[in-house]
Design a protein with these regions (language model features):
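A generic structural signal for beta-strand entry/edge sites
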Residues: 45, 97-99, 147-151
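Secondary-structure transition/turn motif
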Residues: 52, 104-107, 153-160, 211
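Beta-strand-rich interaction surfaces with strong enrichment in secreted/lumenal proteins
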Residues: 35-36, 89, 154-156
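Generic detector of short, aliphatic-rich beta-strand segments that form the cores of beta-sheets
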Residues: 162-168
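A surface-exposed beta-strand-loop module
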Residues: 136-162
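Extended beta-strand solenoid/passenger and fiber regions
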Residues: 62-142, 169-215
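Generic structural microfeature
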Residues: 43, 97, 126, 159-160
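Solvent-exposed edge beta-strands and adjacent loop segments
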Residues: 1-73, 173-195, 200
């Protein structure tokens, strides 16, 4: 099931998302480890409780929870700690291909990781997706992009060896609730204490990224 186009109605800004990998570790009799990365790409997790600050927020959350029927339906959320792509290379022309996947590359001295971005905003200007081929900006009339896959389509194929670059001012993460029940009583106590009191347990309303077939 593809993520519905509607977005989570509250702002999950505090702390941002938590990327999580899955690794199998086998420990031998001598204590040596064999590690295997089960997932090459992480799943991002959020705690929606951080978005609840008022009783009106609780009402909005409950209404949305009913609309998506708990864990059944997916939706979009903005990761305020990581929601944009600065101009970077996404591919190289071969004279034939006209489609290129929007990606975000994270680079350190240790290595790099390419994250596939599937849910960019629709705009095709500085507020959304921009594209360059061989260091020349591609006019919006000569390209398009999908807000459900992140695939950029050019009207003409870049010449062999020409670098294709892109930027994205804002993208979303497809998620679902990871619970089928919300503790409204604990949420109310959280709000009454100021939604930040150090002596009050933070409610847990987990959201987890979803992957769809063929992604």
């Amino acid at each position: 099931m593809s993520a519905n186009l509607y977005q989570f109605p509250l702002t999950v800004s505090q702390w941002g998302a938590s990327p999580s990998y899955l690794t199998d570790i086998t420990v031998g009799r001598n204590g040596q480890e064999v590690r295997n990365a089960v997932w090459q790409d992480p799943l991002y997790r959020f705690n929606a409780a951080f978005a609840v600050k008022t009783y009106a927020d609780i009402e909005t959350l409950i209404e949305f929870f009913h609309a998506v029927k708990g864990r059944e339906q997916s939706f979009l959320v903005k990761d305020w700690s990581d929601f944009a792509i600065t101009r970077q290379t996404i591919g190289t022309g071969d004279g034939a291909d006209t489609t290129f996947q929007l990606i975000k590359t994270y680079t350190t001295s240790f290595g790099s990781y390419q994250r596939t971005i599937t849910k960019p905003v629709a705009a095709e200007d500085s507020t959304g997706v921009q594209v360059w081929v061989n260091n020349v900006a591609v006019d919006a009339a000569n390209r398009s992009h999908s807000t459900s896959t992140g695939i950029i389509t050019l009207t003409s194929a870049p010449a062999n060896g020409h670098t294709v670059e892109a930027s994205c001012a804002e993208f979303y993460v497809p998620v679902r609730f990871d619970v089928d029940m919300i503790d409204v009583q604990l949420l109310s106590y959280w709000v009454s204490a100021g939604a930040s009191a150090s002596n009050v347990m933070i409610p847990d309303i987990p959201l987890v990224e979803v992957r769809f077939p063929n992604e």
